[in-house]
Design a protein with these regions (language model features):
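Conserved N-terminal catalytic core of the sugar/cofactor nucleotidyltransferase
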Residues: 1-15, 20-26, 34-116, 120-121, ...
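Short beta-strand segments
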Residues: 57-59, 141-143, 222
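Catalytic-core segments of class I nucleotidyltransferases/pyrophosphorylases
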Residues: 112, 120, 126-133, 146-147, ...
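Short beta-strand-to-loop element that shapes/binds the nucleotide-sugar donor at the catalytic cleft/hinge
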Residues: 139-153, 169
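Short beta-strand-to-turn element immediately C-terminal to the catalytic PLP-Schiff-base lysine
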Residues: 143-144, 153-156, 179-180, 286-287
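Structural signal for interior beta-strand "rungs" in well-ordered beta-sheet cores
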Residues: 250-300
Length: 300
């Protein structure tokens, strides 16, 4: 680890239900879906970045059975990750629930929030962190070239001055990746508790990031033009990013029963599926639970 990053921790939230990827995440967690090959998982991009930081924490889905594959995968990555399990779907309220453990002991440090379903390449974590420290605000937002979804950020010099879903006025997108002062997170958690928070769901964007933008406390950092970022939490984007990484080849997960004459083209077949000679699979995401086969055709 670079000495600069000894004061930077990381959090990987993995506790959501991933409803945008239904039905394929009904029985397997989004973080554990293959990404580009059967040896890579969606969450690996976040873990790769987190391994450059001092301490890594992960919030887990409340269902212990659902998270067993993820915990097993972490063990194979030789990653020292401390986990915290949500008691129900909480969103960013996990950071309130576990604020003492996540931030109290490292109050003078900072934390990078790394969503488990984001693919990111070419991020200079050290430069991102140094920019955050030099600008001195509570939050620094990682910006990327404009996407056709999500939040767009208005910028003046190195400060975010507006954030909106309206693309017409802005030329940069928020990646949903942030570096945050631990002290600011503790203050937010304390305020929520004082106002009567009792476990209700919270949004990192709406309840923490956006208020900081309008208080003038959000800096920005632009991903290098040679970098790459995408949120793979929808069926279409999950499919397209797999095809990008596989060079257009099929992504056949582990534990797939594949007959010798199966006809599969530019598709993703998730673990547990038995593909016989009768199937013709073309530009699809396919999963199976018990005897129910789920097929999603992606229109390009």
């Amino acid at each position: 680890m670079r000495e600069t990053l000894t004061n930077l921790n990381s959090i990987i939230p993995t506790a959501g239900n991933a409803t945008r990827l239904y039905p394929h995440t009904l029985f397997q967690q989004k973080a554990m879906l293959p990404m580009g090959s059967p040896d890579k998982r969606v969450v690996d991009s976040a873990i790769d970045i987190a391994q450059q930081t001092n301490e890594t924490y992960m919030t887990l889905h409340w269902d212990e059975e659902y998270t067993k594959p993820l915990l097993g995968h972490i063990a194979t990555r030789n990653s020292e990750i401390t986990t915290f399990r949500d008691r129900h779907i909480m969103g960013a309220a996990s950071l309130i629930e576990f604020s003492d453990e996540l931030f109290e002991n490292d109050i003078e440090k900072d934390t990078i929030i790394l969503p488990a379903d984001h693919i990111i390449e070419g991020l200079d974590v050290e430069d991102f962190y140094l920019t955050h420290k030099n600008l001195g605000n509570d939050v620094t937002i990682l910006l990327v070239p404009p996407k056709d979804y999500g939040q767009y950020v208005g910028v003046s010099e190195n400060t975010a001055v507006d954030i909106s879903t309206d693309r017409s006025s802005f030329t940069l997108s928020s990646s949903g990746i942030y570096i945050i002062r631990n002290k600011a997170m503790l203050e937010w958690a304390a305020m929520e508790k004082k106002q009567g928070w009792a476990g209700e769901i919270r949004s990192m964007l709406q309840d923490f990031i956006t208020p900081n933008v309008y208080k003038g406390q959000a800096s920005v950092y632009k991903l290098h033009e040679s970098g790459y970022w995408d949120d793979v939490g929808t069926l279409r984007r999950y499919y397209l990013n797999n095809m990008r990484l596989s060079g257009g080849e099929n992504v056949i997960d582990n534990n797939v029963e594949l007959s010798a004459n199966a006809k599969i083209r530019r598709s993703i077949v998730l673990g547990g599926v038995a593909v016989t000679d009768l199937y013709r699979i073309d530009k699809e995401i396919v999963s199976q639970n018990d005897n129910i086969l789920y097929r999603t055709r992606i229109e390009l």
